[in-house]
Amino acid sequence: MKKSIFFVPVLVLFFFGSRFSRVASAGDQRALAASFVFGDSLVDAGNNNYLQTLSRANSPPNGIDFKPSRGNPTGRFTNGRTIADIVGEKLGQQSYAVPYLAPNASGEALLNGVNYASGGGGILNATGSVFVNRLGMDIQVDYFTNTRKQFDKLLGQDKARDYIRKRSLFSVVIGSNDFLNNYLVPFVAAQARLTQTPETFVDDMISHLRNQLKRLYDMDARKFVVGNVAPIGCIPYQKSINQLNDKQCVDLANKLAIQYNARLKDLLTVELKDSLKDAHFVYANVYDLFMDLIVNFKDYGFRTASEACCETRGRLAGILPCGPTSSLCTDRSKHVFWDAYHPTEAANLLIADKLLYGDSKFVTPFNLLHLRDL
């Protein structure tokens, strides 16, 4: 998740954004017109390139398989596409959502959607402070306020409201950093854990997320997909710092994720479903989906679910981020993890497929294809 190299591939992002600036045909009412993406490094499309932050992915070999940039890094924390990229493509979106902080995030480019996600960001404002700068969820929603005003100017108030309510998808992939880079940070958070129980910490997360989702609803967001927290105790970083073997995971980290996920499901499928008129919330069970991938990785064609494809060798393996000095695996399609924290494009494709077309085991109350067509 962390990056210390401050090279910014602005030209790559600008070229990429202009190349895919076409808006979905007005006659194709089933196609997804716009995708608004909120979250952390799992779906960051390059916002952190424009921040002075330690959380960056703007150096090779990141993006090596991202075809629109011809293999150049764009700020995505993976070798290719993120889950949000893939979902947008499959639902008919004509262009990837442009990063909010990118110079070409204006005018008609906004009509394809905007990506506000930021590596290191969390639900809570204190999360990710170890990276110096990042966009937390509150700031991301603030930025959408600006985008919403631009839509009224571009389309007029009535058309803008219908465009956002009926033909747009709001994806929220956040929460992992609130544990990994807040509650579970070694030494930094130890004192806080003495005074704040897991229950009260999760309560705080849910309270903040509730308000953030309501703010989006008040600005005409109606179709939501919200991912729960994955089994963060099984990522290479956690295995490395806790000196675990390939088959072991960190119990505390996974228990915290499970506790939060239960509260999140109630928030989405009961509370907000009943209180926010005409809103549709899909609960994406990323935890079980990813755990299935980790446990049964061979069944999905992977060689390993514990070793990162791009990593530093030796005693720091599984800790340092992917960068120019990292060792790269020979076959990226055989690794579940790209680096110590993030999945490969191959894993993202499998996860996205389950979210798009899967059953209630992984998406509740229905899949994303159904959500789009409502």
Curated annotation (Swiss-Prot):
All disulfide bonds of the chain are none
Coarse class of the primary localization is secreted
Entry keyword Thylakoid = no
One Pfam short name: Lipase_GDSL
| Signal peptide bounds | 1-26
Keywords for this entry? Glycoprotein, Hydrolase, Lipid degradation, Lipid metabolism, Secreted, Signal
Localization per Swiss-Prot or TrEMBL? Secreted
EC number of this enzyme = 3.1.1.-
The positions flagged as glycosylation sites are: N104, N125
Q: Which residues of this protein are catalytic?
A: S41 (nucleophile), D339, H342
Q: Which InterPro entries does this one have? A: GDSL (IPR001087), GDSL_Est/Lipase (IPR051058), SGNH_hydro_sf (IPR036514), SGNH_plant_lipase-like (IPR035669)
Listed GO CC annotations: extracellular region
Listed GO biological process terms:
lipid catabolic process
Molecular functions (GO terms): hydrolase activity, acting on ester bonds
Entry's PANTHER family? Answer: GDSL ESTERASE_LIPASE, GDSL LIPASE/ACYLHYDROLASE FAMILY PROTEIN (AFU_ORTHOLOGUE AFUA_4G14700)
The family line of this record is:
Belongs to the 'GDSL' lipolytic enzyme family.
Q: What is this protein called?
A: GDSL esterase/lipase At3g50400
Q: Which organism is it from?
A: Arabidopsis thaliana (Mouse-ear cress)
